[in-house]
Amino acid sequence: MKKIDRRTFLGNGVAAAAVITAGKPFDAKGNNGPVPLKKNNEDPFNPVTFSAMPTNSFGRTGYKVGILSLGGQATLEIKGREEESEKIINRAIDLGINYIDTAASYGQGVSQLNIGRVMKTRRGEVWLSTKTHDRTYDGSMRLLEESLKNLQTDHLDLWQLHNVQRQDQVDQIFSADGAIKALEKARSEGVVRNLGITGHFEPLVLLEAIRRFPFDSILMALNAADVHYLSFRNYLLPEAQKQGMAIVGMKVTTRSRILSSWTPPPLDQQTDARLRTPKPGTINIREALTYNMSLPVSTTILVLMT
C-alpha cells in the first residue's frame, strides 16, 4: 500500500473533507455495517486510517493515531444540532479519523450525547477521549459515570484533567481528595486505559503538573502565534517530549484569528481585551496545519462549525 505523506494529504484536502458530509460506516472488510466493539484492554481499529493519512505513535501507548483528529466542540456541542453532529462524526470516521476528543463540560454534556449516539455502533473504530473539569475525587467520579453513560460505552481510552490553568488547581488536584485519585482509581479498575491533562492558558502550570505525575498524554495549544506569548512550544513541549508523552495539538488557528480569511468583528464587539484586533490574520489553513505538524505532535484536533 502506498504511503501518503503529510504534504500530499493536506494538498488533497482530506483534512477539510473528513468532517463535512455524511456517509455509511464500513467494517474491516469494506462492508457496510459497524465494527464490533473492542474489549477494554484492546486498541480500537479504524480500517480506513492507514490508507487515508499518515499516523504517529500516541506516546508510550503503542496506539497508532492519524495525524488529524476530531474535536467535540463547535457544531457537536450545540443543542438541536443532533443530525448534523452525527453526520460529521460518521463521515470523519469513514474517512479515517480514529481519535475523538470531547469533555463533560462541552455544551453541558451535549457533545458527549451526540458522540455517544455514534459510539453505540462504532466504538471499536476510534480512540475515545473525554475530560473532567472537577478538581476533586468525588466530583470527578460523578463526571466519569455521567460521561460513560452519555458516550454509550463501558470504558474510555483516555480520561483527562480539563483545562488546568492555575497553581491552586494543581494543588487541589494532587491533594488527598483530589481528582488525580479518581484518575488512578478509574485506571486501576479498567474503566479508563490512559490518563492525560489539558490546558491552553498557562504552560508553566502544566509543566509543574506533568513533573508531579507520569501522565500518558497532554493536550496543549500549539499554533503559529504561540511563540509570542505564554509559549507552550517553548516552555512545555520540550518536557512533554522528554517524558515520552503523547502530545496533542489544539487551537491550531486560534479560533480563526491567525487566518487571512478571518474578518474581525467591530472592536466594541470584541469582548476579550487580550485578543482585540482590527486586523485579520496572515496565513491560510494549510499553512496553519503545516506549522502544527512540523512540531513533535501525535495528532492535531480539528473542530467544525456548520
Regions found by a protein language model. Give the residues of each.
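Alpha-helix-loop-beta-strand connector modules within alpha/beta enzyme cores
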Residues: 116-129, 181-185
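Conserved beta-strand positions in the central sheet of alpha/beta enzyme cores
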Residues: 69, 99-101, 157-160, 196, ...
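Distinct, well-ordered alpha-helical segments
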Residues: 111-120, 140-152, 170-177, 201-214
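N-terminal secretory signal peptides and thylakoid transit peptides that target proteins
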Residues: 1-17
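Conserved, mostly hydrophobic/aromatic
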Residues: 58, 70, 100, 115, ...
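N-terminal small/glycine-rich loop or linker at the start of catalytic domains
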Residues: 61-76, 160-163
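Beta/alpha (TIM)-barrel catalytic core signal, keyed to glycine-rich beta->alpha loops juxtaposed to Asp/Glu
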Residues: 45, 164-306
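C-terminal segment of N-terminal export signals and the immediately downstream linker at the start
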Residues: 23-68
